[in-house]
Every structure is written in C-alpha cells, then in structure tokens.
C-alpha cells in the first residue's frame, strides 16, 4: 500500500528556521534506510507558507491567495511517499524517524487511493 507521510509545520519551520546540521545528517541517514528498505518513493521538505499560494475555487471563479496562511490550523513542512505492506509498517518506520523539529512535532500517515479503489 502507498502512504503519504506528512511532517507537520511548527512555528519555527514557518519562520524559516533551518534544521541543525546534526538533524540534517540524521534525516539523511534515515532517508538512506528508507531507500535501502525499498519503501521510499519520494519526499521533500517544503519552504514556509509565506512563499506559497493557494487557488480558491468557487464555481467557475478562481482567486489566488498569497501566503502565509496564519488562519490555517495545521500546515505541512515536509512529506514522504512510501510503499509499505500495511499501516502498521508505516507506523513502525515513523517511530524510527528522528524528531524532525527542534521541539515537539507531529507526523501524520495517510493511505493514498489506488486505481482499484475506484473500480
């Protein structure tokens, strides 16, 4: 099953505070483990929402909203896409992840739809 793994943004990540060199090295080693295990399909870190844009749809109208998105309760600062046996395997891999932020943080795992889900 394929899953997307979201690293939730924090106040620091939204300020553009870069991870320490130690954390970058630890995350690099972790990503190498994911690749060697054959589960990592992709992933990246995201820049703060101040650099983002949203396109709002209302019928045939479109409007562009510039970041930052202070009113949004939860933002994403990074993601992976993994191919795992099941959700339990994904949870076990997340538990092995270095804390992606200097302080408290959350990582969310969500299954992706497959073509067979729409058959």
Q: What are these language model-derived features?
A:
Residues 1-119:
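Conserved, structured core segments of small domains
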């Amino acid at each position: 099953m394929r899953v997307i793994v979201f690293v939730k943004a924090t106040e620091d990540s939204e300020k553009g505070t870069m991870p320490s060199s130690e954390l970058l090295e630890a995350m690099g080693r972790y990503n190498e483990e994911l690749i060697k295990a054959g589960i990592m399909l992709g992933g990246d870190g995201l820049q703060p929402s101040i650099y983002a844009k949203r396109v709002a749809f209302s019928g045939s109208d479109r409007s562009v909203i510039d970041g930052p998105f202070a009113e949004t309760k939860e933002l994403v600062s990074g993601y992976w896409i993994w191919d795992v046996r099941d959700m339990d395997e994904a949870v076990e891999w997340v538990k092995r992840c270095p804390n992606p932020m200097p302080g408290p943080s959350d990582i969310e795992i969500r299954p992706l739809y497959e073509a067979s889900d729409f058959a």
